[in-house]
């Protein structure tokens, strides 16, 4: 029989010895015991139930020995305060993307000041961006597009769990929207942006869908696709918001000037101080 402290210490050391993140095993402990972090801290000297210790040990071994993301083991990731189901069919939502959602909400308040607006999340994956916006702002009517049937199913399940009333289209980037001749006030997207030949963490490369990772030879393929046709699906007064690679600031600025020469736009840094988002406003 082990205490919470002993089990956590073993798991952290086991993870670190294999060059894995020790913080991840705490998430597994919270998941298995259905406890919050502060509850585990309060119970550190208490004995773990045998069944929970066995399950925790099993999951730690899978995480460390087989390099399976903890989010896949738990079946979810927390994003903007809500649980989103994830699988190997979708990109695991990142903390940086929460900042994109927050900045879209701020820009919406500045530009539309509480008006009813139509929003589209292009290439939604798990639905984290679009569904978070729908849940946060009642005046946003949200549509989500996704090319992958498997990813779309995950997003639809998340919408059901969150009781979010949204519309889904399956298709590549803007194509289903163009086919339906739809118009929107806000377009938001976090498309695949890793260049094809770039070396990336094997843990990411081996566990996340390449369809959601790679953005062509220079990582800008999908931004070009979206910006080329964006004016066809947007009302004259609009917001376009992208997440992108930290080193794509100047390339994104050039694309914006090419397709929206009259727009005002700004590149925003994430909490790590990296250029991560470009917000475009047409008024």
Task: Kindly give the residue locations of the regions a language model identified.
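N-terminal auxiliary segments of SAM/dcSAM-dependent transferases
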Residues: 1-74
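SAM-dependent Rossmann-like transferase core, predominantly class I methyltransferases
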Residues: 44, 54-138, 142, 147-157, ...
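Short, solvent-exposed loop/helix junctions and linker helices
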Residues: 1, 50-53, 91-95, 216-220, ...
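S-adenosylmethionine
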Residues: 139-282
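Short helix-terminating capping/connector loops at secondary-structure junctions
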Residues: 21-22, 112-116, 181, 235-236
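Alpha-helical structural context
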Residues: 31-32, 107, 136, 259
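Generic hydrophobic alpha-helical segments
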Residues: 11, 100-104, 108, 226, ...
């Amino acid at each position: 029989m082990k205490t919470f402290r002993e089990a956590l210490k073993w798991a952290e050391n086991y993870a670190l010895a294999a060059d894995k993140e020790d913080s991840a095993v705490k998430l597994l402990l919270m998941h298995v015991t259905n406890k919050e972090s502060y509850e585990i801290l309060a119970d550190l000297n208490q004995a773990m139930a045998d069944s929970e210790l066995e399950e925790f040990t099993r999951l730690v071994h899978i995480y460390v020995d087989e390099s399976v993301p903890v989010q896949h083991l738990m079946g979810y990731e927390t994003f903007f305060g809500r649980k989103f189901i994830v699988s190997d069919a979708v990109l695991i939502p990142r903390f940086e993307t929460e900042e994109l959602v927050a900045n879209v909400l701020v820009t919406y308040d500045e530009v539309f000041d509480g008006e009813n607006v139509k929003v589209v999340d292009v290439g939604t994956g798990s639905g984290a961006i679009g569904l978070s916006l729908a849940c946060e702002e009642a005046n946003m009517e949200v549509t989500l597009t996704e090319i992958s049937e498997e990813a779309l199913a995950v997003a639809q399940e998340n919408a059901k769990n969150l009781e979010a009333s949204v519309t889904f289209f399956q298709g590549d980037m803007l194509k289903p929207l163009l086919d339906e001749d739809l118009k929107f006030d806000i377009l938001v997207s976090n498309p695949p942006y890793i260049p094809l030949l770039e070396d990336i963490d094997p843990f990411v490369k081996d566990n996340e869908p390449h369809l959601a990772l790679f953005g062509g030879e220079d990582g800008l393929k999908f931004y070009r696709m979206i910006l080329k046709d964006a004016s066809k699906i947007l009302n004259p007064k609009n917001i376009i918001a992208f997440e992108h690679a930290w080193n794509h600031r100047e390339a994104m600025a050039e694309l914006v000037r090419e397709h929206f020469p009259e727009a005002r736009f700004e590149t925003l840094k994430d909490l790590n101080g990296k250029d991560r988002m470009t917000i475009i406003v047409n008024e």
